Amino acid sequence: MPKTTYHIQLKGYVGGEDFDRKSVDSLLANQSGKRVNVLIDSLGGSLATGLSISAAFKQHGDVAVHFVGLNASAATIASLGAAHISIDAGAMYLVHKCSMAFFEWGSLNADQFATLIADCEKVKADLDKLDQNCAQLYAARCKRKPEELLTLMKVGGWLSAK
């Protein structure tokens, strides 16, 4: 079996150096009109960047993504725009509900708590929308119902190639 040549290797944090939309666009431009083989090895990162890279793969057309190692979160979303997705026999793939960093320190009075609760309810509603969007993307790719994928995301377990 011939060894695959990877035109793009995306490793590390999605949204970090060499794993952002600008870098991917530049690398895809060098392969205009050609099949592009992409290796992904990432525990995830920025959902916004993952969605953007997915769109870049879809716009390019003939993109094949291959996962190695442990892959999660935004890295899995980035792959969804590829024409073909494969996973190494020993690799793992994690889908989970979206999350957001939350830091609140100090003492709060009743009014401040009310404001904080309202802010948290808004964040929860936004996260629910992001979860629905991701579930729809995964579901379209694997030809399942979004509700099934949302349940899988809620569990947040690692999936193997099997």
What annotation goes with each model-predicted range?
Residues 1-162:
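Terminal-region recognition feature
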